[in-house]
């Protein structure tokens, strides 16, 4: 997702928003950590035959590696630091079914923009339509008929949890404060953990250094002080699987999905994809483990919403690659719509339901469409305060004051609109019924494009009020 940062002058303050970064000696720099994170050949996924051996961690340590995570419910682990010889030794060990190199997942980088001014002191999450910048910037919420749903009392429930698998969440900014369940949140990105411990040692490991996750989370659920989300009461679980550079490992992402299912998430949002796809002929192991993990999530009663991808690929004609996560079982795969005219942060926006030119499509895989934005109209949120930009090999923090907003376009932004609606459907119709919730979602869309299911919109563009009025 392409993002732009804008200055936002706020008339009220938030605790902990003015923490200044420090760079102690003897700790990894952001650039060094990013290089380590991108070294995909040094990360491996280990599949077990049956249950995890009790001595697995010590065995990996003896071989010179480290266990980064274990997903016992599905029978795999992620390790790093093993040499080729050590990997070969581990493959021959009792109880090990397979060991193979992990692969990298990537989202688009961020870009900077210009300034606006605002006052959030009179806003309230009880009325999302009164959010400070809803009238002037959030064409996306209007496009999915969210204001009418809010007016009818559909605000979501704190008893429903949406897991955001992403770069983290700025968990105590205006729009997130109190919504994020830190006790059930976690990080699968050791490189980011090291940066946070060095620069912002009092922050939770899910603090967002990349900006992407906070924008995504806001579309699903928000306090609606500055920007409204589809829901204003849904709880959020932050699961960091992407570092500040926007990259992470497939193994870490799958482990994050297992974590979400094991810790009571009702719906999970995955606004990310495998760089270049996965070649089915040569990477069949990955397809197998992806299927196992998504089947596990379904068995735990969790709905999984995934972004279609931003490569303008027709997935119907690309039978060689496992595209993003849209081919995984049980998922809701979301394409993007966006305006065809207007100024990105000013409007007026024309034809907001047009298929976005970057969105991956495919009659077989696309379930529904939702606003993702375009060069003419962005999807926006508060910028994560500890968002890192590296300038001349040194970290800078353009959003540190808490007075910035972020705008972007991509299927990363469209997916969380659906996640917020799914959370509301679960609040209304009950938990643990992912197939029923998917049916209700599909039954409540506006059928755009060719009648029935088509490659661009799937079954149609979501309509929040219509889906919640069944």
Question: What do the predicted segments below correspond to?
Answer:
Residues 21-114, 151, 158:
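Inhibitory N-terminal propeptides of secreted protease zymogens
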Residues 166, 323-427, 431, 465-469:
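Extracellular S/T/G-rich loop segment that most often corresponds to the catalytic His/Ser-adjacent loop
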Residues 122-133, 189-207, 277-284, 316-320, ...:
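Surface-exposed intrinsically disordered loops and tails
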Residues 2-8:
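Sec-dependent signal peptide recognition
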Residues 137, 148-186, 190-251, 263-267, ...:
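Subtilisin-like serine protease catalytic core
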Residues 23-25, 94-161, 174-177, 192, ...:
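Protease zymogen maturation seam
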Residues 21, 151, 156-158, 223, ...:
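Substrate-binding/access-modulating region of protease and related hydrolase catalytic domains
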Residues 14-16:
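C-terminal motif of bacterial Sec signal peptides marking the signal peptidase cleavage site
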